[in-house]
């Protein structure tokens, strides 16, 4: 209790002290600016006094900006509202909302451009002689100074607004013309005639020729087999015509016998139907036999097809017959071995070893033999 009472008495004594001497009471906020009294914080923002840091940004916080001017009301909380900021100066309108826009911050000074001052925080222009207002802080990455031979991006010259003007932009056409006029010619390799890789060219052409030759020979052998089998089938049809004649004679005999037997029956309606059916079959058989006999007359290949076809050309039936012949060939003939016109050894296949792949002096994805 004694401790608490003594602390309370100390607080009462501190509160009874004059206001301007109680350092801890006046600015409880350590971010606010203390004036020229003992215990002044040198890290805070000092104005035109000895020890002023000109490199420090002048307006770190718009809520601080305190002046030691006569008539300053120290008891008033200086920045209760950033839109008020009242000074007791002649001509100051305390009813005017002082900070309508924090980017404007207007002072009644001569020559001060009120619309200009804080339009863009990256511009921050001062009325100094030789200061380029359009140049300063347009781009925080450029930050150009009026110094001779100052070159950040390899494109600044000591002319105001040089890079911003479109007159100095180089079009692609100008760039191309400039390259043609002043650029170096590309190096041209002129090889002597004996330096050309004749052997490599010949080997490439030879490999192509070998592959085409092999394919043409295999095609020729297939065509020879097809022609041979067609001749065979024509001979077989000629041999089969005699057998077909005998078969036709036997069929006629059988049909006559059957018709005699059927005529003896009593069911006349069924008899008529049977006779009609047999006559139709007979007509079909005679037509087939006529076509076969016609085929046997013209047995000279390759003209016997054209005499049978209507207008001497190719037709779908002809193509279908050819396809049937080739299918017959494929099913009946054994596969013929290809004729070797020159010896063709097996290609040498490099054996594959599971070697470790080393990372040093080697690109990924290539094997060791690429570098040997």
Curated annotation (Swiss-Prot):
Keywords noted in UniProt: Repeat
Biased amino acid composition, Polar residues: 38-49
Keyword Repeat appears in the UniProt entry: yes
Composition skew (Low complexity), residue ranges: 1-37, 53-100
Location of the region described as Disordered in the Swiss-Prot/TrEMBL record: 1-100, 122-150
Coiled-coil intervals, chain numbering: none
Sequence repeats: 29-40, 41-52, 53-60, 61-72, 73-80, 81-92, 93-100, 101-112, 113-119, 120-131, 132-138, 139-150, 151-162
Name by which UniProt lists this protein: Proline-rich P65 protein homolog
């Amino acid at each position: 209790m004694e401790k608490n009472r003594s602390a309370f008495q100390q607080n009462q004594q501190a509160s009874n002290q004059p206001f301007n001497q109680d350092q801890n009471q006046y600015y409880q906020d350590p971010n606010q600016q203390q004036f020229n009294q003992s215990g002044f914080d040198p890290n805070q923002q000092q104005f035109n006094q000895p020890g002023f840091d000109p490199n420090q940004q002048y307006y770190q916080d718009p809520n601080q900006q305190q002046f030691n001017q006569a008539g300053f009301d120290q008891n008033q909380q200086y920045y209760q509202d950033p839109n008020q900021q009242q000074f007791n100066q002649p001509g100051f309108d305390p009813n005017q909302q002082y900070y309508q826009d924090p980017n404007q911050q207007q002072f009644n000074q001569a020559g001060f451009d009120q619309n200009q001052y804080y339009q863009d925080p990256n511009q921050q222009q001062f009325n100094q002689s030789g200061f380029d207002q359009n140049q300063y802080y347009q781009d925080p990455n450029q930050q150009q100074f009026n110094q001779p031979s100052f070159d950040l991006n390899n494109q600044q010259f000591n002319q105001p607004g040089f890079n911003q003007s479109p007159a100095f932009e180089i079009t692609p056409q100008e760039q191309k013309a400039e390259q043609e006029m002043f650029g170096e010619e590309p190096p041209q390799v002129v090889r002597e005639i004996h330096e050309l890789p004749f052997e490599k060219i010949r080997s490439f052409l030879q490999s192509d020729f070998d592959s085409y030759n092999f394919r043409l020979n295999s095609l020729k052998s297939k065509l020879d087999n097809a022609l041979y089998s067609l001749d065979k089938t024509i001979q077989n049809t000629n041999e089969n015509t005699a057998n077909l004649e005998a078969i036709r004679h036997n069929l006629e005999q059988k049909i006559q016998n059957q018709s005699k037997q059927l005529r003896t029956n009593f069911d006349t309606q069924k008899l008529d139907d049977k006779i009609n059916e047999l006559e139709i079959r007979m007509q079909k058989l005679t037509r087939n036999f006529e076509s076969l006999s016609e085929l046997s007359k013209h047995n000279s290949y390759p003209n016997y097809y054209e005499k049978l076809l209507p207008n001497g050309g190719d037709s779908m039936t002809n193509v279908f017959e050819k396809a049937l012949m080739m299918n017959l060939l494929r099913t009946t003939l054994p596969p013929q071995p290809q004729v070797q016109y020159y010896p063709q050894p097996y290609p040498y296949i490099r054996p594959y070893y599971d070697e470790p792949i080393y990372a040093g002096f080697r690109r990924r994805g290539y094997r060791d033999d690429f570098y040997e």
